[in-house]
From Swiss-Prot:
NCBIfam families: nqrD (TIGR01939), PRK09292.1 (NF006777), PRK12405.1 (NF009070). Composed of six subunits; NqrA, NqrB, NqrC, NqrD, NqrE and NqrF. It comes from the Bacteria. It is found in: Cell inner membrane. It catalyses: a ubiquinone + n Na(+)(in) + NADH + H(+) = a ubiquinol + n Na(+)(out) + NAD(+). This is Na(+)-translocating NADH-quinone reductase subunit D. GO terms for molecular function: oxidoreductase activity, acting on NAD(P)H, quinone or similar compound as acceptor. The gene is nqrD. It is a multi-pass membrane protein. It is an enzyme of class 7 (translocase).
Length: 208
């Protein structure tokens, strides 16, 4: 039976202590693309968490039967199958969101977080631990997306999840929107400030 303390560590350490974006600087490309709106960031975060968790689980199940020479191909086949399933489900039940996310759901297969957990963890550890580790890392990625998307949508349009938070000047209110935050470069700066803030709060995360 898996140790509960270890499972909790695997699940929650990627949230702050070992965040895949803030500490490992992985998955940056999609973080720039899907964080203009909080809704797309939520869906992308959930998608990555599920794909990372279940791909790690299935890879761990068959890890002892995969020849070393083709392990990357097998990992990518499993990940691609799950990504295709997620993409089809989004198209079936959330078509508008699927169109907004465009190719970025399909590109989860190339996300370094998914491949990294499969290669570094799932190939060495039991299925349950691999599942928890994958979901934890996907959730850590999703948390960063949520923070970035909240800042970008709120400052860029005065809205969150499509609901008005700050009444804009155009609608007779006081808030002047800042279109810069709806452009990709703003995500770089926000992520940079988040990394700086985390490493100031936790100096042990700073690189030597």
């Amino acid at each position: 039976m898996a140790d509960m303390k270890r499972l909790k560590h695997l699940m929650f350490s990627p949230f702050i202590d070992n965040n895949p974006i803030a500490l490992q600087v992985l998955g940056i490309c999609s973080a720039l693309a899907v964080t203009t709106k909080l809704q797309t960031a939520i869906v992308m975060g959930i998608s990555v968490a599920l794909v990372t968790g279940f791909s790690s689980f299935f890879i761990s199940l068959v890890r002892n039967y995969i020849p070393n020479s083709i392990r990357i191909i097998v990992q990518m086949a499993i990940i691609a199958s799950l990504v295709t399933l997620v993409d089809q489900l989004l198209q079936a039940f959330a078509y508008e969101l699927s169109k907004q996310l465009s190719v970025f759901v399909g590109l989860i297969i190339t996300n370094c977080i998914v491949m990294g957990r499969a290669e570094a963890f799932a190939m060495k550890e039991p299925p349950l631990e691999s599942l928890i580790d994958g979901i934890g890392n996907g959730a850590g990625y999703g948390i960063m997306l949520l923070v970035v998307a909240t800042v970008r949508e709120l400052i860029g349009s005065g809205k969150l999840l499509g609901y008005t938070v700050f009444q804009t000047v155009q609608d007779g209110g006081w808030y002047q929107t800042n279109g810069l935050f709806l452009l990709a470069p703003s995500a770089f700066f926000i992520i940079g400030f988040l990394i700086w803030g985390l490493r100031t709060w936790k100096p042990e995360q700073a690189e030597e």
